[in-house]
């Protein structure tokens, strides 16, 4: 199997979605001309144009709200935070709107939106850019949260997240963007909500974060 970087796996999944589904578009801070805080969207603006790769103001509340509206109207937005730390600014939109619309409408309105968010510390960006709120968000009914740990999982999970008809948060550990791993050329997805059993046995370790 070819070996690729974590960021390249994400980029492949995003590019596939943009190429194959005209309803998919992206928006976030510096994802266009700058190519994203971690270079995941580098080259996308030139390839797909400003109608589908939208640089936004520094207002997570505004562009998450815009993403929810676009998703409810039938599009499939992919919203990018520079850091999951800034999800706090958009908690009202995420928790009270994105997570609830399907239930409040009796299933008449879906919110097929992906929120991508670098998470964690270790990249010298200071305390305000180094939080890990994925466990908070995972407690919200109506929100799915995935956190890939290698390029194989990153590609399989981003593919499934984009196809899901409900909001999915992809928490991407910032320390892993430069990590390499084996990823097959053949198409695959990783089912959301299904545990990955890496090794079977009789002993269980419980790790609390």
Q: What are the language-model segments listed below?
A:
Residues 1-171:
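Thiamine diphosphate
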Residues 9-13, 156-167, 178-205:
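Glycine-/acidic-rich phosphate or pyrophosphate-binding loops and their flanking alpha/beta elements
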Residues 122-123, 176-178:
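Short, acidic Gly/Pro/Ser/Thr-rich loop/turn segments
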Residues 207-209:
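Conserved small/polar residues in nucleotide/adenosyl-binding loops
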């Amino acid at each position: 199997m070819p070996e690729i970087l974590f960021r390249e796996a994400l980029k492949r999944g995003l590019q596939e979605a943009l190429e194959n589904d005209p309803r998919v578009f992206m928006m976030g801070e510096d994802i266009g001309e700058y190519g994203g805080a971690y270079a995941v969207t580098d080259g996308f603006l030139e390839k797909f144009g400003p109608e589908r790769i939208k640089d936004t103001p520094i207002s997570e509340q505004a562009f998450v709200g815009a993403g929810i509206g676009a998703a409810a109207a039938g599009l499939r937005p992919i919203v990018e935070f520079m850091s999951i730390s800034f999800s706090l600014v958009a908690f009202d939109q995420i928790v009270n709107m994105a997570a609830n619309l399907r239930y409040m409408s009796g299933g008449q309105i879906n919110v097929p939106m992906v929120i991508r968010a670098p998470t964690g510390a270790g990249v010298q960006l200071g305390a305000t850019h180094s939080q890990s709120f994925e466990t908070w968000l995972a407690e919200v009914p109506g929100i799915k949260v995935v956190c890939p740990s290698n390029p194989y999982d990153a590609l399989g999970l981003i593919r499934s997240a984009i196809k899901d008809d409900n909001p999915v948060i992809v928490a991407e550990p910032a320390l892993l963007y430069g990590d390499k791993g084996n990823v097959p050329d053949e198409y695959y997805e990783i089912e959301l909500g299904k545990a990955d059993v890496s090794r079977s046995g009789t002993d269980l370790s419980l790790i609390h974060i």
